[in-house]
Amino acid sequence: MALDETCRDRSYLFGRILACAEQVERYAQNLATDEKRTTNAERAQVMFVQRPAKTTVLLQNKLTPYLSRIQSKNGSRRRYQLMLDLIDQLGEENFTNKPLSELYLLGYSSQRMAFRRENEESKKNSNSSEE
């Protein structure tokens, strides 16, 4: 299923936020080392479903050290900005610790797939410009 950017369901938006946090951290890790380790977003997924607002704040705090690393990297900065935009879309009334429905997983997966397609397109464009 393709990413639905018009979906305003609370669980779906929180799922997209989780995918953004994961991607920003993963990108910063890749800049520092080739070692692939589990991101904070991946480790916190179970807690995220039960207490999404509190876990989002925790993940935001854990991303802070990575932000200086990605300062000049447009793709990752855009993903961080998307995360902030999605939090804003939730609004105060939906930014709560009420547990998420299963729809969060669809938002998470769809956003990750959109990032994957974006990465593949970017690689394809950079390869064709080198030729």
PLM region descriptions:
Residues M1-E131:
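Intrinsic-disorder/low-complexity detector
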